[in-house]
């Protein structure tokens, strides 16, 4: 996932990305959050062009964006100016989703984004992802949790860096995933 995300910002043989891209990291501690920043700043960093007033970031615009996503995605905090670490892990992950969904990205890469997140948060985010997909956003979702595949239209099974199976949601079975992953399908 990180290689695809990196390809969006530079020319690379064989990969062409023609739309804005955002990443929702599963390992929020190392790849996702900015630990010294507020919740609002963590959400707004992907939307700087919209938040600027001249050369500076408009605190009002940043607060409006953060407030909108606090309500829409249900980030549980009284003050979006609190440090990101004041949130639970699930709410930190919601802030990362808010960063991606609040941006201009038409493609959202999700790198095992629900790892270690409670079931309530997962269900809320699944609903939001489906809503955004219906509105035209594309999601590329790497997951280690097979139940998350129910949220996908197409499933690609990878083995040794290559696609070994392309399944529609209707074709999806755990048996086909395991067979593709561990069989001689390469």
Placement of each model-derived feature along the sequence:
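Glycine-rich phosphate-binding loops of nucleotide-dependent enzymes
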Residues: 1-186
């Amino acid at each position: 996932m990180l290689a695809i995300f990196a390809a969006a910002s530079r020319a690379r043989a064989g990969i062409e990305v023609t739309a804005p891209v955002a990443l929702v990291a599963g390992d929020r501690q190392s790849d996702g959050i900015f630990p010294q920043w507020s919740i609002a700043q963590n959400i707004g960093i992907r939307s700087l062009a919209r938040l600027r007033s001249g050369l500076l970031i408009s605190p009002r615009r940043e607060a409006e964006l953060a407030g909108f996503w606090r309500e829409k995605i249900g980030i549980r905090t009284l003050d979006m100016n609190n440090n990101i670490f004041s949130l639970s892990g699930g709410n930190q992950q919601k802030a990362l989703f808010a960063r991606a969904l609040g941006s201009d990205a038409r493609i959202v890469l999700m790198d095992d984004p629900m790892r270690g997140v409670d079931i309530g948060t997962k269900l809320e985010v699944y609903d939001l992802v489906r809503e955004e997909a219906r509105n035209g956003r594309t999601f590329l979702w790497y997951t280690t949790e097979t139940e998350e595949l129910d949220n996908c239209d197409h499933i690609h099974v990878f083995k040794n860096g290559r696609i070994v199976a392309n399944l529609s949601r209707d074709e999806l079975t755990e048996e086909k995933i395991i067979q593709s992953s561990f069989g001689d399908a390469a």
